[in-house]
UniProtKB/Swiss-Prot annotation:
SUPFAM superfamilies referenced in this protein's UniProt entry, alphabetically: MCP/YpsA-like
Family named by the database record: Belongs to the UPF0398 family.
Disulfide bonds: none
Transmembrane segments: none
Protein name from the UniProt record: UPF0398 protein MCCL_1095
Length: 183
């Protein structure tokens, strides 16, 4: 697999209100381990749509991994200026990530016009990647549930890899990580 899309929860959906919260560190460590496995199997491109939360945390991980691996980061936003209504801190954070991305574009060369832009971008990304890592748990419903159904429908008609990460997967990882640190 050469290209993968990563998406999932927004920070507030996980009760995360600051990137310095310890949960963010564990999510990034988990994503780093997962991405290393994909990179060692031939992954070249990681694609995100530039949303706060799992997507930008994954972007941070990719930027770190670029120092050791030949992997690239692409940001394909649904529309122009998608981050313009974010607070100043989040805009700065986003711009710092964009400065290190290998490719940035918008699926729609226009400002926000409607929800169709998100659906069209999701479809474009699915059509142009070979798999998705979806950080989502049916036990903890939130915004990714809509994409999950689109993803399942797409994969049922196409040869496409789905890697769903649940909160239990993350919890298991954290427990193993903590045990390993004890030794």
């Amino acid at each position: 697999m050469k290209s993968i899309y990563i998406t999932g929860y927004k920070p507030y959906e996980l009760n995360i209100f600051n990137n310095k919260q310890p949960e963010v560190r564990y999510i990034k460590l988990f994503l780093q381990q997962k991405l290393k496995e994909y990179i060692e199997d031939g992954l070249e491109w990681v694609i995100i749509e530039g949303q706060l939360g799992v997507e930008l945390w994954a972007a941070e991980v990719v930027i770190r991994l670029k120092k050791m691996y030949d992997v690239k980061l692409s940001i394909i936003t649904p529309f122009l200026e998608h981050h313009s209504k974010w607070n100043e801190e989040n805009q700065l954070y986003y711009n710092q990530i964009c400065a290190r991305a290998d490719f940035i574009t918008s699926a729609h060369n226009d400002i926000y016009r409607g929800g169709f832009q998100f659906r069209n971008t999701d479809q474009f990304v699915l059509d142009n990647t070979e798999g998705t890592i979806l950080f989502y748990d049916d036990e903890h419903e939130a915004s990714p549930k809509f994409f999950k159904q689109t993803l399942i429908d797409f994969a049922s008609e196409n040869q496409y890899n789905i890697d769903v990460v649940t909160l239990e997967d993350l919890s298991d990882f954290v427990n193993e990580y903590m045990r390993a640190k004890e030794y």
